Amino acid sequence: LVIENDKIAICISGGKDSFILAKLMQELQRHGNKHFDLVFLCMNPGYEPHILKQIEENAKLLEIPIQIYKSDIFDVSLKLNEHHPCYMCARMRRGFLYQKAKELGCNKIALGHHFNDVIETIMLSILYGGEYKSMPPKLKSTNFSDMELIRPLYLIKEEDYNDLSFINCACKFTKEKSSDSKRLKIKNLIKELKKDNPNIEYNIFKSSENVNIETLLGYKKKNEKHSFLENYNKNC
């Protein structure tokens, strides 16, 4: 994920995942065998003052030199879709981070998605999206040339650092609805399944490496849908 002379923007939201990512990357930079530069990028999409203050205090405590950039993404996404602003907000935030990272001379952005985010995304896509979609450890940007997204916490489980106390969610759209979120339902479902099968998390994770294309009715590649019938007679 990291190569010599990279300049990586560590994207900090204020939660435990992004702060753990920032600290681990800082330690890797100090003690690893590769030379790379880091920028600790925090976008303020419209956080409440006490949330922003807590982010700044935690960064100071961890000795992470964050750079905070103001935006009005919360307000804009709410105007665009009053009832369902989350999708638009997520897209706008990602675009803002890419743009700012590129302006700062970075070639990569790093996000704090971990092992549990990966398996929950797989289950969400199947049960709520009617598709099979995972979350790769690295991804080339389609909108920002020569930019790449990496997920260094990809193999780290949330339970490994879940006792740390940080902001759980700084988003004002979800703070009152988090108990009813689809992701939380999936998280609880996996927890229940794990009682009968301790390997359930690992099996979900490995499923994205063991897709048997010959048994699928179709697949998508570069937004183009393909049917199993395209090559059906060729296999006879």
Question: Predicted segments — roles?
Answer:
Residues 3, 32, 36, 134, ...:
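Secondary-structure transition/capping residues
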Residues 38, 108, 116-192:
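Catalytic subdomain that performs nucleotidyl-dependent activation
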Residues 51, 85, 123, 127, ...:
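Alpha-helix boundary/capping detector
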Residues 90-104, 137-144, 189-209:
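Short, basic, helix/turn surface patches
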Residues 47, 73-75, 139-142, 156, ...:
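Residue-level detector of flexible, active-site-proximal loop/helix-junction positions
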Residues 1-124, 128, 159-166, 235:
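ATP-dependent adenylation/nucleotidyltransferase module used to activate substrates
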Residues 166-236:
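The feature marks non-catalytic terminal segments
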